[in-house]
Amino acid sequence: VDLSELEWHARRTLCFTRCRRVTVDGPVLLGAAHWTAAFFGCEDVTVKNLAIFGYRENSDGIDLVNCTRAQVSRCYIRTGDDAVCIKAMEPPPAVGGRDILVEHCTVWNDKVRALGIAGESRGEIYNIIFRRCTVLHSLADWAAEVGALCVVLCDAGTVHDIVFEQIDVLDERANGINCMLF
């Protein structure tokens, strides 16, 4: 699906809100105008074999926002912003984000984060695993809270039990690992 003719910020490409048992398998998405695959308050999400080729600011790859029980695997993500990030934009009593596995993904990001917990952290985020992924390139130059592997807490939420294992970072232009609390 070629979205490159859309104006910047025209719309999100794939957007799921408060859905259960969602599976996204195999699409190729090119030139998203805004967040490419966004899940808000979803449960039991599976994303696999997704290919994203983005270049614009705010063209996040996969954003799991206030989600529970999600798996992201075997995806290729090239973005002009975050590649795969967990976010908690709704405050409690909403679920912040929990029981999420991201594995066997290859990412390339410009501007912000390749893999991690993003600054939108208003709830409790926990039991998150990033493993066996490759960061081909990370040019994190937009702000201080950037890097290839990030945990950023800048709202009233909490973050615990976050694991990064067997992650290969081949080219990082700012911060390889960045953990910020503010």
Language model: regions and residue ranges:
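Extracellular/periplasmic carbohydrate-active domains that bind, remodel
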Residues: 1-182
